[in-house]
Amino acid sequence: MPPHPPFCVLMAGLPGSGKTTLSRALTARGFIRLCPDEEMFRRHGVYGVDFPRGVFPTLERPVLEDVAADLREQLKAGHDVVVDHGFWTPEDRAKWRAIATDAGATPVLVYLAASHDELWARISKRNEFHANDPNSIYFSESDLQRYRTRFIPPQPDEPHLLYEGDSAAVIATLESFSA
């Protein structure tokens, strides 16, 4: 068991903002990584190919419930966990912070801010891998623009770390919390 209550790292970010990159850096430091997109791919296949795009929220709901149950178990077992998911709204983030707190963990929200051009460059590059990579769900630029209108970045009253592409800085901050 870690010398501190386990961390639960939650991320707020749009597709292409670096969530998977950061979560993989945390797994290299011993974090358990939970990824709803990978579970969606495992259960249902390729987004927009094996199931219609419009049913994603309906199919995702039970996946998120199962990921939340797994999160509770991992945190109660004393493991540090990172949830590789976008958490687009304050309400969604509050719900998952409560799951972490109820399991005895310290929730840490990381905001992955990025410009439209940066997001679109990353998404368009990884779109070619969407058929075989659960972390490369195909999105058009108009999808990204629509998603941006639904994404609510953390505000000053919602404690968070700002990720600017430096995983080591996030790791150092987490280590300072447990010192």
Predicted features along the sequence, with ranges:
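Hydrophobic anchor at the beta1->P-loop junction of P-loop NTPases
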Residues: 11
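Conserved substrate/cofactor phosphate-moiety recognition/catalytic segment
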Residues: 17-79
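Conserved beta-strand scaffold positions in the cores of enzyme catalytic domains, especially
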Residues: 31-33, 107-109, 158-162
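Small-molecule kinase domains that catalyze NTP-dependent phosphoryl transfer to phosphate-bearing small molecules
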Residues: 131-179
